[in-house]
UniProtKB/Swiss-Prot annotation:
This is Ethanolamine ammonia-lyase small subunit. The keyword Lyase applies. It comes from Xanthomonas campestris pv. campestris (strain ATCC 33913 / DSM 3586 / NCPPB 528 / LMG 568 / P 25). It is found in: Bacterial microcompartment. The gene is eutC. Its cofactor is adenosylcob(III)alamin. InterPro entries: EutC, EutC_C, EutC_N.
Amino acid sequence: MSTPTTPPRDAWARLRALTPARIALGRAGTSLPTASHLEFQLAHAQARDAVHLAFDPAPLQAVLQQRGRRSVLLHSAASDRHLYLQRPDLGRRLSDEAAEQLRGTTAVHGGGADLAVVVADGLSALAVHRHAGAMLEQIDALAAHEGWSLAPVTLIAQGRVAIGDEVGELLQARAVIVLIGERPGLSSPDSLGLYLTYAPRVGHTDAARNCISNIRGEGLSYAEAGHKLGYLLREAFRRKLSGVQLKDEADRPLLGTDTASQAAPRNFLLPE
């Protein structure tokens, strides 16, 4: 008669509670357990839905109006979602009508603001619907604290990151901030990205931009994203540059911790 043994401790259990990443899913024979397989299929469906979800700017326009912020609704050169996904280059430029509309806005209200803010659906309108309003509030508060002037917020359907260069150039802004839905992941269909470019001009490459990514409830908080943005903007204006020459060195104090008394890190796979 064999002696019963205690099942081995699942060393990954604690990590599974800390991350939505697909780790230690287990197995059923040579495949995944049914629950894990169904969760994967659901996440994949949510990511696909986020890519194809139509951008609805009306709620954001209403919020901006309540805050006393002017907004302009524009469209990229990609006429629909199908063309947007097939022709990334069209998502980087305004349509002719949108460009003319923005020129008219500059002629009437004047240009030369410190900051132009662009909100574009990108590859996840869901991210914009959920998080753009809160990040715009962070940007407005930062601008008020620093004394920076703001151009009207431009809301762009079928837009990609580089479209901010054209918007910033037409508005004659010192810098442009683009809030855009990031490519959905299998655990993050609603991740918002923020891109900063100093002296925006059509033709800039990604090397001219700074990125703050994964802004969402389960990722980077609005407050921390605003803190990073404040540092990058102050340095961009001081040094008159952005992109690869500007590194994010914003302080990140660990609240409630005493570094002197912290225990040495241990291997979570080893027994207690």
